[in-house]
A protein has these predicted regions:
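Feature primarily recognizes SF3-like P-loop helicase cores of small DNA viruses
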Residues: 18-45, 51-59, 63-65, 69-173
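Glycine-rich phosphate-binding P-loop
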Residues: 1-18
Length: 173
């Protein structure tokens, strides 16, 4: 259903790390997911299916969000290993609930989009043109928030963290 999920993902990517690679299909293999996460500061996966996010994939996504390493056997060797650092943002969209495992759920910000129908439905081109007009203002607000946080971060006190991303929660407060 048309709800603007893919367009919203493109806008997030544009704000954080504009580059040639746009939204990607979710990789079928864990190794391909690791390579994608290791090579981008933000990986945007479009039209994901919850069926692809099993235990192994969930663990990799947790490591990427929190920071971690993926170690595997080096090609053409029996005992040598390759260690790949994982630290980056992940954005995924899909029609069903994509995450179920509690450790990943605690690292996720989930947004639910309503369907867009009729006259409210816009072309991607028009939507992106409008976004480009307001993008400098959005970035200005983001930078202002970061600046305020950096000035006052030592004064921010939280007695009860409700998510694992404690630094994110500190900034949000």
């Amino acid at each position: 259903h048309a709800s603007g999920k893919s367009s919203a993902c493109t806008m997030i990517q544009e704000l954080i790390s504009p580059r040639c690679v746009d939204r990607m299909a979710f990789p079928k293999k864990v190794d391909d997911l690791v390579i994608s996460l290791a090579n981008h500061c933000i990986s945007v996966f479009d039209n994901c299916s919850a069926r692809r996010i099993g235990e192994d994939v969930s663990d990799i996504l947790c490591q990427s969000v929190s920071g971690g390493f993926y170690t595997k056997r080096k090609l053409y060797s029996d005992m040598d290993t390759v260690t790949i650092p994982l630290k980056g943002m992940v954005v995924m969209n899909g029609c069903d609930s994509l995450v179920e495992r509690p450790d990943l759920v605690s690292r996720v910000l989930q947004f639910n989009f309503s369907s867009i129908e009729g006259e409210r439905l816009e072309t991607d081109q028009k939507l992106m043109e409008e976004f480009q007009k307001v993008k400098p203002k959005i970035l200005g607000v983001i930078f202002e928030i970061i600046s305020c946080y950096l000035e006052e971060k030592d004064d921010v006190k939280i007695d009860n963290y409700v998510i694992r991303l404690t630094e994110f929660q500190r900034v949000a407060v």
